[in-house]
């Protein structure tokens, strides 16, 4: 969220005191991320201890906090586990929001700072540990399984029809509509290819592993000491491993072949399916297109988040960006 929500700072401070026993002297809104349902803050105690405070409205499931807590307890050090409340819960309630508190670790994300060779190797080892962890039944039964759904593809085609039929007065919506019209053929090709690959993958017997499902540079936090942390476990899923590793080499910030080699030397390439990698790269584009269409075409609200959303949307079509990188790994991109 790029714009601060209409929640007084004192209300957040009172929640931290009441629910977590934290005597914080202030909170600072951090304009981070593209998720319009999540606001994040930095809180600081009187002793100078920092906390990362997430306010989540809308859908919430316990697995988003219980899973990282389990992974951290299992020895996967790249996970930042949420703190417990005074009543030993992993979140608190604040009006219509859930409040989740983490230790604040200074650093930058993978968009702001390139990973070193050592960090790429640690990233590969960490993802291997996540994909091979043994989940207890209580957790595995609570995590959705991949079904290769057509929902997002259908939404993109719906929005494509909408921009062909409707004129948008709001400037950002008008820009997005024009971008969709200019890239009509590219969008339809990506949707068609994802549909073909999804049907094919449904017929194959594939091992499902625990996947983060939203591995991208913005969800990789790099500390000044060089440690890496995988954050934002809002949508875990049991799926083929390609769901997570598709963006290694599949987004502009991570398209350096040498970096991908460092990652896979630790993670391993055995068993990875090029068709599954292509499917998840196409689907990643389609998920983003649908989400930004919802954000921008269905409402005029959102302020600065709208312009940022448009930039993310349009970036998919730039040379060497997400669409091109999906086609690059697809053995039959024009099928």
Regions found by a protein language model. Give the residues of each.
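Active-site acidic catalytic loop and adjacent metal/ATP-binding pocket
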Residues: 36-45, 52-53, 82, 192-245
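All-alpha amphipathic helical-bundle segments outside canonical DNA-binding/catalytic cores
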Residues: 143, 272-281
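ATP-binding pocket architecture of kinase catalytic cores
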Residues: 46-142
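Active-site activation/catalytic loop segments of kinase-like enzymes and analogous catalytic loops
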Residues: 241-272, 282-300, 310-316, 320, ...
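A cross-family kinase active-site recognition segment
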Residues: 113-182, 208
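Phosphate/dinucleotide-binding and metal-coordinating scaffold of catalytic cores
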Residues: 39, 44-49, 57-63, 76-78, ...
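A glycine-centered beta->alpha junction motif in the catalytic cores
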Residues: 99-113, 161-173, 286-303
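Regulatory N- and C-terminal appendages and interdomain linkers associated
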Residues: 1-29, 185-186, 192-193, 200, ...
């Amino acid at each position: 969220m790029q714009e601060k929500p209409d929640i007084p700072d004192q209300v957040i401070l009172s929640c931290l005191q009441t629910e977590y026993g934290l005597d914080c002297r202030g909170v600072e809104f951090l304009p981070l991320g593209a998720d319009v349902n999540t606001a994040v803050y930095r809180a600081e105690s009187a002793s100078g201890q920092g906390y990362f405070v997430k306010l989540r409205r809308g859908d919430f499931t316990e697995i988003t906090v219980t899973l990282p807590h389990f992974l951290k307890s299992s020895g996967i050090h790249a996970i930042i586990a949420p703190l417990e409340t005074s009543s030993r819960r992993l979140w608190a309630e604040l009006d219509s929001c859930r409040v989740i508190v983490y230790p604040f670790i200074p650093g930058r994300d993978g968009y702001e700072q390139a990973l070193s060779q050592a960090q790429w190797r640690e990233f590969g080892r960490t993802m291997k540990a996540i994909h091979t962890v043994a989940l207890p039944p209580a957790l595995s039964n609570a995590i959705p399984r991949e079904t290769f759904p057509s929902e997002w593809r259908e939404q993109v085609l719906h929005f494509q029809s909408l921009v062909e039929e409707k004129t948008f007065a709001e400037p950002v919506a008008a820009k997005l509509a024009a971008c969709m019209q200019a890239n009509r053929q590219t969008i339809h090709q990506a949707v068609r290819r994802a549909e073909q690959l999804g049907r094919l993958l449904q017929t194959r017997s594939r091992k499902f592993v625990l996947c983060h499902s939203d591995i991208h540079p913005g969800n990789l936090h790099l500390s000044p000491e060089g440690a890496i942390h995988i954050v934002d476990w809002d949508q875990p899923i049991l799926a083929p491993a390609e769901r997570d590793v598709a963006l290694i080499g599949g987004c502009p910030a991570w398209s350096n072949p040498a970096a991908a080699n460092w990652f896979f030397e630790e993670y391993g390439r055995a068993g990875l399916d090029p068709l599954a990698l292509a499917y998840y790269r196409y689907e990643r584009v389609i998920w983003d297109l649908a989400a930004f269409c919802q954000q921008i075409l269905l409402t005029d609200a959102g302020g600065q988040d709208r312009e940022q959303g448009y930039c993310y949307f349009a970036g998919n079509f730039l040379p060497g960006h997400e669409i091109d990188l999906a086609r690059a790994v697809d053995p039959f991109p024009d099928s």
